[in-house]
C-alpha cells in the first residue's frame, strides 16, 4: 500500500514540476515578445536626474492608462484612471476655494482605500505638502501631528472620525470624510459653498466633459518639500521627517527599472501595508500606480484569513509584506500540510527530495496567489527558520532594507541574487557607508545624490 502511495506522490510531483516549468518558460516567452513595454522603458532617459518632475509620473500614467482599472477597494468599487483624474480635479476645485496655497499642509488619516490614494495624489498634484498619518495612532497623537504640521485640511476614515476632536485642532479649516469626500467639519465658508455646489463648479469649468488633455497640474522641483511623514518614534510624540520630491522620484524610478521589467502592463498588486508608512506607500502604491497597474486595497484590518482570501482572489503579480505576514501564512497554511512523517520520509530520499521540494514550493506559491514574480520582505528581519525553509525550497523571496528618511529604499536584490541573511545590495541613486571597523555591530550612513 505504501509503495502505491509513494508512486502516486512521485508521479504527481513530476507532473507539477513539468507544469511549473512550462508555465515559467511560456510566461518568459510572452514577456520577451510582447509589444507593450514597461513604463520605465517608455520614459526616455528614465534616470532620476532626467525626470522633469515626480508629478509627471502621475500625469503620464493617468493619460496613458485612461480607460484601465486603477484602484479597487477589495470587495468594493473600482476606479479607472480617468475616474481618479476626475476626483483629483474636483478636490483641486475645493482646495482652491479654501484658499490653499502651494506648500500648505494637508493631512490624511485612515485605513488603506482608493480614496486615501486619491486624496494623496490630489495633494501632491496641487502643489501642497501631504502629511500621511498612521490610522493606528490615538486621538491625542493625531491632534499633535495635525497641529505640529500646521495642516489646513484633514481627510479621515470612518474609524478616525470617531476618535478625533476638531476642537483640539483649532487651525484646521476643514475635515473631509474619506469614503465620500463629504465635509465632516468646516470652518471656511468658501470651502463649504464649493463642496455644496461641486458638480456645478466642475461642469462650468469643463462644459464639454473632462478629458486627459485638460490635465494641467503642479510641476514640482526635485528639492521641493512634498511630504511630512511622522514616524511612530521611540519616545514622546512622533517625529516629522521632511521628504523632497527627489526622494520619491528615486524610489519610483528604481522600482520601475528593476521590477517593472518582470511585470506585465496589466499587472495586479494588493496593498496590505499601511499607506501612511513609507514602505507600503512607495512600493505598494506609488510604484504600481505610476506603472499603470491595477491596485487592490484591503480596507479592513488585515487578518491572516482575510489576507489569504485576498491573495487567492486578486492573484497579485508582486507581493510586498512584512515578516509577520509571511510567518503567519507559512506556519498556519503550509507547515501543517508538510510536517508529517510521510513528507519527512520523502524529504530524506535523495532522488525524490528535489521533486518534493518543488511540490512544496508550488504549495507555498499558491498561498500567495500563484502568480507573483517574487515576494519582497521588509520592515524587520525575516525569521531565520522561515527564511531557511523558503530558501531550501527555492521560493522566490527577497529581503530589502530602508528608512523613512530615504522614502524608503536603501538596499534590495532580486530574489535570484538574494543571499540568505542579507538585505540586498545598495539601490541605484544611493551610497552606503558602514561607520565602524566592525560592521556587524554598528550603524550605517546613507547618502542620495543632490
PLM-predicted stretches and their roles:
Residues 105, 111-131, 135-139, 147-153, ...:
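A short helix-loop-beta submotif of the ANL/AMP-binding
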Residues 80-82, 218, 226-252:
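Conserved AMP-binding A3 loop
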Residues 66, 192-230, 237, 262-268:
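Conserved pre-ATP/AMP-binding loop-to-beta segment of ANL
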Residues 59, 96, 114-133, 142-143, ...:
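Hydrophobic alpha-helical segments in the ANL/AMP-binding
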Residues 356-450:
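Conserved AMP-binding/adenylate-forming
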Residues 249-268, 275-361, 371, 396:
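Conserved AMP-binding/adenylation subdomain of ANL enzymes
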Residues 49-51, 59, 67-121, 138-143, ...:
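Conserved AMP-binding/adenylate-forming core of the ANL superfamily
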Residues 23-28, 39, 59, 98, ...:
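Structural core segment of the AMP-binding/adenylate-forming
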Amino acid at each position: 500500500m505504501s509503495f502505491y502511495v509513494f508512486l502516486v506522490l512521485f508521479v504527481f510531483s513530476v507532473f507539477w514540476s513539468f507544469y511549473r516549468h512550462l508555465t515559467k518558460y511560456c510566461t518568459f516567452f510572452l514577456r520577451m515578445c510582447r509589444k507593450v513595454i514597461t513604463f520605465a522603458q517608455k520614459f526616455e532617459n528614465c534616470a532620476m536626474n532626467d525626470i522633469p518632475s515626480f508629478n509627471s509620473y502621475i500625469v503620464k500614467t493617468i493619460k496613458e492608462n485612461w480607460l484601465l482599472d486603477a484602484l479597487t477597494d477589495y470587495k468594493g468599487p473600482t476606479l479607472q484612471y480617468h475616474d481618479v483624474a476626475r476626483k483629483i480635479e474636483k478636490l483641486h476645485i475645493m482646495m482652491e476655494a479654501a484658499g490653499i496655497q502651494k506648500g500648505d499642509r494637508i493631512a490624511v488619516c485612515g485605513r488603506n482605500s482608493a480614496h486615501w490614494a486619491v486624496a494623496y495624489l490630489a495633494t501632491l498634484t496641487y502643489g501642497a505638502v501631504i502629511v500621511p498619518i498612521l490610522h493606528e495612532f490615538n486621538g491625542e497623537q493625531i491632534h499633535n501631528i495635525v497641529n505640529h504640521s500646521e495642516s489646513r485640511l484633514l481627510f479621515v476614515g470612518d474609524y478616525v472620525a470617531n476618535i478625533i476632536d476638531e476642537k483640539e485642532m483649532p487651525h484646521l479649516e476643514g475635515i473631509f470624510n474619506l469614503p465620500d469626500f463629504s465635509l465632516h467639519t468646516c470652518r471656511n465658508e468658501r470651502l463649504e459653498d464649493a463642496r455644496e455646489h461641486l458638480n456645478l463648479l466642475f461642469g462650468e469649468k469643463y462644459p464639454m466633459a473632462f478629458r486627459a488633455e485638460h490635465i494641467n497640474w503642479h510641476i514640482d522641483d526635485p528639492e521641493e518639500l512634498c511630504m511630512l511623514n511622522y514616524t511612530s518614534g521611540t519616545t514622546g510624540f512622533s517625529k516629522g521627517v521632511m521628504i523632497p520630491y527627489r526622494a520619491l522620484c528615486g524610489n519610483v524610478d528604481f522600482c520601475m527599472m528593476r521590477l517593472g521589467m518582470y511585470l506585465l502592463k496589466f499587472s495586479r498588486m494588493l496593498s496590505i501595508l499601511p499607506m501612511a508608512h513609507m514602505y507600503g506607500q512607495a512600493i505598494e502604491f506609488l510604484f504600481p500606480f505610476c506603472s499603470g497597474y491595477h491596485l487592490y486595497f484591503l480596507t479592513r484590518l488585515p487578518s491572516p484569513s482575510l489576507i489569504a482570501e485576498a491573495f487567492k482572489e486578486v492573484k497579485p503579480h508582486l507581493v510586498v509584506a512584512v515578516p509577520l505576514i509571511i510567518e503567519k501564512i507559512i506556519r498556519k497554511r503550509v507547515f501543517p500540510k508538510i510536517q508529517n512523517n510521510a513528507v519527512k520520509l520523502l524529504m530524506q530520499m535523495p532522488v525524490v527530495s528535489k521533486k518534493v521540494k518543488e511540490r512544496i514550493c508550488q504549495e507555498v506559491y499558491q498561498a500567495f496567489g500563484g502568480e507573483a514574480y517574487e515576494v519582497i520582505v521588509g520592515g524587520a528581519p525575516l525569521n531565520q527558520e522561515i527564511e531557511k525553509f523558503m530558501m531550501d525550497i527555492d521560493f522566490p523571496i527577497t529581503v530589502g532594507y530602508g528608512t523613512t528618511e530615504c522614502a524608503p529604499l536603501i538596499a534590495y536584490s532580486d530574489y535570484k541574487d538574494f543571499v540568505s541573511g542579507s538585505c540586498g545590495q545598495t539601490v541605484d541613486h544611493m551610497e552606503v557607508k558602514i561607520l565602524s571597523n566592525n560592521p556587524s555591530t554598528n550603524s550605517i550612513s546613507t547618502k542620495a545624490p543632490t
